[in-house]
Each structure stands twice: as structure tokens, then as C-alpha cells.
Amino acid sequence: MRKEIVDDMRRDQRFKSIMLDTRVLSRVIGIFVPELGGISPEEIAEMRKNGDIVPVSTELVSAKRSMSADVVYSISHPGGEKALLDIEGQLYRKPGDIDYNRALAYAVKLLEDQRGSPEWVDYGSLRKVYSAWVMLDPHADERNSVVRYRLKGESDTVDHVPEIPELDKLEIVRVGIGNPSEAES
């Protein structure tokens, strides 16, 4: 096996181990899931211990093709809401290499895989999905950054703007890791 492939596999395994560590997760999960942002790391660790935040299968399977995610958590928010969090570690290979369509495909696959699960009732029971992409070696202008992509409804009618219901079931979060000394205060 080529050295580059072996190195990539080792980096990938290290990233997965780090994101499965409760001490690390309890400090970063609020970045990925804003609803958990006001909860202390100690409370997050307690949620993890109590089974409110649990790792689940990373195999995303469909009839046509399967995908393997790095780390996926099932989350039960203190308010009773439930969500799924996919965390992916990503290295840039060349400028513009991060494929937003890939991030969207992972998020949509997590939505789709809920159908047929033991918790499935109907489309109203879909959990919100967060797909967090941690850029491990971002370009200099993207370091220490968090960018969110959400679905937003807009009306194209001129005369009448109907009430547009909130469609809050999918969010892609891109985090650019950087040197803390470079972060703005």
C-alpha cells in the first residue's frame, strides 16, 4: 500500500478516536450543535454518560451505494428534541478541494436512513441532522472559522407572500481549525 494512503488512514483513525473522546466532544459539540452551546462541558459529559449522546453506526447504506461516515452521534436535547450529528475530518488536497455537495450528500443520507429505523413514525418524526466538517489544514484565510449552511425558504410571488414554514432539519457546519494565537479576541 502506498505511504500516502497509509498516512491518510492513520490520520483518519486518530481523528475518529479524538471525536469519540468524551473530554474532547464535551468541549466542541456546542460549535456543531448550537442548541447545546450553552451547556457546560461537565453537563455534556453527563449527557454522554446517561446515554443522551451516543455514538451510532457510521455506515450509511442505500440501494445504490453505501457511505462510511467518520463519527455519528445520536443526541437527545434537554428539551426533548432529537438530532443526529455526523463529524467528518477533512484535509485539503488542493485549493477548493472541499466538496460542499459531498457534505450535503452525507447530511441527506442521514435524513434518508431514518426512514425504516425503529424510531420511524412518519416524516414528522425526522430528527434534525448536523453534518460537521472539520478542516484540519484549512487555508490561512479560513482558519479559526465556523461557517453554517441551512435551508431557507423564500417566496417568489410579488403580490402575496405566504407564510413560509420553517424547514429546520438539515445543517452543514464547516469548522476551520487554526492556531489559537491567530484567533481574533
Describe each region flagged by the PLM.
Residues M1-S185:
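Elongated, amphipathic alpha-helical interaction scaffolds
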